[in-house]
């Protein structure tokens, strides 16, 4: 998982989700795009 200052959807399958007050990008098809806002 990458920690980034600003999240971007890198593919159309990416979803932005808020968990515990943090923003995450999840991608079921290609998990290498997982990100968290730091």
Swiss-Prot record:
One of its GO terms (cellular component) is ribosome. One of its GO terms (biological process) is translation. Keywords: Ribonucleoprotein, Ribosomal protein. InterPro entries: Ribosomal_bL36, Ribosomal_bL36_sp, Ribosomal_L36_bact. One of its GO terms (molecular function) is structural constituent of ribosome. Transmembrane segments: none annotated. SUPFAM superfamilies: Ribosomal protein L36 (SSF57840). Belongs to the bacterial ribosomal protein bL36 family. This is Large ribosomal subunit protein bL36. It comes from Bacteroides fragilis (strain ATCC 25285 / DSM 2151 / CCUG 4856 / JCM 11019 / LMG 10263 / NCTC 9343 / Onslow / VPI 2553 / EN-2).
